[in-house]
Amino acid sequence: MLNEIQQDAQSRMNKSVASLKNAFSKIRANRAHSSLLEQIHVDYYGSMVPLSQVANISVEDSRTFKVSPWEKDMVAVIEKAIMTSNLGLNPQTMGQIMRIPLPPLTQERRGELVKIVKDEAEQAKVAIRNIRRDANSDFKELLKEKEISRDGARKAENSIQKITDTYIKEIEAKFCEKENSLLEI
């Protein structure tokens, strides 16, 4: 019973960290990475679909994307979606191919991105702590129903605390790594 609660908590904590990594991948550093454009949705005949489902996205060099729509009609729609995506990108259309240069990050924009990254990391830490709280309340419930002893509950709570500390340290490491990549000139 205790192991099941601990495994469930650890699994949920893993998902929180994976979600944080996903959120960080969508925040651009100074290099072109296709995940930056994956969050853009395009109006495809009345329904919103991810850009990757209507065009081929590739990285031409460290500062340029190349987008090749699969249909000629989609060029203008994709261009509009990229410009309104609030990523500060301006596509240059040449026939059916779009090249999207990444503008250099200003110091002000870097500061804004660091704040966003810090907020994401803080939300992940809160999620980890909430998972710990849920597990501890499950242990207390088992103690109340006399299914485990006080010592067993205390050991389980200490074990969950160690797991929580490990995940919090991992989140802090990911935050520092992302912050350094954003502040790198």
Curated annotation (Swiss-Prot):
Broad class of where this protein is predominantly found: cytoplasm
Single annotated GO MF: ribosomal large subunit binding
InterPro entries documented for this protein: Ribosome_recyc_fac, Ribosome_recyc_fac_dom, RRF_sf
GO biological process terms on file: cytoplasmic translational termination
A Pfam match: RRF
Record key words, sorted: Cytoplasm, Protein biosynthesis
Cellular compartment(s): Cytoplasm
GO cellular component: cytosol
Domain of life per record: Bacteria
Protein's job: Responsible for the release of ribosomes from messenger RNA at the termination of protein biosynthesis. May increase the efficiency of translation by recycling ribosomes from one round of translation to another.
HAMAP family in alphabetical order: RRF
Family: Belongs to the RRF family.
Protein's name in the database: Ribosome-recycling factor
Organism encoding this protein: Ruthia magnifica subsp. Calyptogena magnifica
Originating gene: frr
